[in-house]
Amino acid sequence: MDAKTNDKSAGKCPFTSGRSHRIRDWWPGQLDVQVLHHNSNLSDPMDEDFDYAREFESLDLNAVIKDLTALMTDSQDWWPADFGHYGGLMIRLAWHSAGTYRITDGRGGAGAGQQRFAPLNSWPDNVLLDRGRRLLWPIKQKYGRKISWADLLVLSGNVALESMGFKTFGFAGGRADVWEPEELYWGPEGTWLGDERYSGERQLAEPLAAVQMGLIYVNPEGPNGKPDPIAAATDIRETFFRMAMNDEETVALIAGGHTFGKTHGAGDASLVGPAPESAPIEDQGLGWNSKFGTGKGGDSIGSGLEVTWTQTPTTWDNNFFDTLFKYEWELTKSPAGAYQWQAKDAPAITPDAHDTSKKHVPTMLTTDLSLRFDPAYGKISKHFHENPDQFADAFARAWYKLTHRDMGPRERYLGPLVPKETLIWQDPIPAVDHALVDDKDIAELKAKVLASGLTVPQLVSTAWASASTFRGSDKRGGANGARIRLAPQKDWEVNQPAQLKTVLARLEAIQSEFNGAQTGGKKVSLADLIVLAGCFAVEKAANDVGIDLKVPFTPGRMDASQDQTDVDSFAPLEPRADGFRNYIGSRHQFMTPEEALVDRAQLLNLTGPEMTVLVGGLRVLGANAADSRHGVFTKQPGTLTNDFFANLLTMDTVWQPVAGQDDVYEGRDRKTNAVQWTGTRVDLIFGSHSQLRAFAEVYACTDAKEKFARDFVAAWTKVMNADRFDLHR
């Protein structure tokens, strides 16, 4: 809502500000592996046995809601409430906490309280939201560890809506805080509000969703500040689609959110000070301090826009649509010089936020007019205008989706306000309704799987394909549900559909035979059997080279149906690249292969050593896509050896690019010049990158064969269980 600010929010250039240079300042093209080690327990101030879910479940949520409700109308002199109510501010606070979510990679969102940290706390679009967090601090301080900042930010938005007469759909807790900023890719730009993310005919680069650096969604003045409602609608549609919202949800969210509060552009934006991260130390993390008038209340400057959408900005009603359709609109500028629109030939009927004796002519943003003048949005807006109950329901559901989209499956939701209805975007999976297999059953299934004719590479690659869709960002994907047998996953190129069909058919036959022979309701799900078969294959691969180990397995997965699977919603989970399988798809664009490997490892919540041992193990086990031989640095494929590392690091091999093949290399014997191996950038990075080479050296040592196998099994099990929220919350 408030989006525009000046350049004072930017920090100083690292090369001219007198500080020492980091390694990546000297070698900016160096692969960044440190992203795999962020938010470790070394930065966590909580006790080792701290369990946020347990703490939240002991919270008196009604007491928190009561305190939040009281806060809404307890205007503070240091930051007076607009219209005597902080509701508009708290809605924007919650919205912008959740609104960074993007469906392409599941990153962003409200799930970790990242709005407290740079860069989000100092984004132009988050101007003055630091005031909202400071208003919440006494409540956070009161309830301490029982409610996270992440949960409190979302809850404050819900309570704000409820306190102004709106009935929300529900609220779930369970968002545990993190303690350091995430190093996410927010765009290529080096300046606030830059838009180098576009190419061609306004093609927005992936995985981005927002239109400019430092914005949550779109520029409220219009594309690049040009006040064109139709062009703005194009940006809105693309951006909200990339945040998993359709047209109806988009209209409901914008109109619902703009039913309350106002924007702030009372005067010259050049009088506004720097953002929190570059504010003077004595300002104690409060940014955007203004020298215009009092700098607060009626003198507030945020986005530079000065718009109050309705005549009842602290009440839920249909006034937004009433105003939008009642008047014709003419272009004007705010006192801060930002483009906005005012009602033509309209009386001054909109209240002032801080002076009850003043009234204003109705105003709107360029992006508000998009909801009327874009044909598709206009049709939806008229329907909502004529059917306010349907508008209220649509906004309630869209707000719930916005604020909970990155929480993952419903089983992670905590608290008494979780709605009973299960929604398709929650990727539902049936609850376990049968007795689970025991050790004796597992032994029987192992014998059947190993006698089925399926190979170690087939079983390993199928289990990996099923489990490795998991994204720690929004807790989606994973082996639970066995969605690898359903559209769209069964048809993904990386999953080798023809081979996958064969493997699944044989596993389904084993499942059917086993379940048909049971009494007492015992069953094995296909989801469990896929993982179990992969575990059997890993055990066999280790045993075949004399390493005796057992791969842990815990039953309890269930099989989802096609009706429980939104094909369009699952499409973004398709890997454009998967370095673990040495796969680069035709649509892969925005990263090098080795960057894509680290990116996928980060989504799987893997550390650098875990990523390293998994790549080395999956190569020798033959799990490459399309049965590629790249990176299979072993003479005994299908066995769990440390050959990948030993053969990569030897000085007996010389590597050189293969002519005509992008990112493919051949390793030749240094003496005979005979080709020994072929590999990709993903393979060779473990010998080239100094930190990854250090990890690889550990596993290449002669005495590391068993350690390699044990570490591989541990990392494998972590991925297989990544979505088992019944085992870890």
Curated annotation (Swiss-Prot):
Per the UniProt entry, the Enzyme Commission number(s) are 1.11.1.21
Instruction: Mention one GO biological process in which this protein takes part, according to its record.
Output: cellular response to hydrogen peroxide
Where in the sequence is the active site?
A: 96 (proton acceptor)
From which domain of life does this come? Bacteria
Which of UniProt's keywords are assigned here? Heme, Hydrogen peroxide, Iron, Metal-binding, Oxidoreductase, Peroxidase
Residues involved in heme b binding: 258
PANTHER family in the record, alphabetically?
A: CATALASE-PEROXIDASE, HYDROPEROXIDASE I, BIFUNCTIONAL CATALASE-PEROXIDASE
Protein function: Bifunctional enzyme with both catalase and broad-spectrum peroxidase activity.
Per UniProt, subunit arrangement is: Homodimer or homotetramer.
Q: What is this protein called?
A: Catalase-peroxidase
Species source reads: Nitrobacter hamburgensis (strain DSM 10229 / NCIMB 13809 / X14)
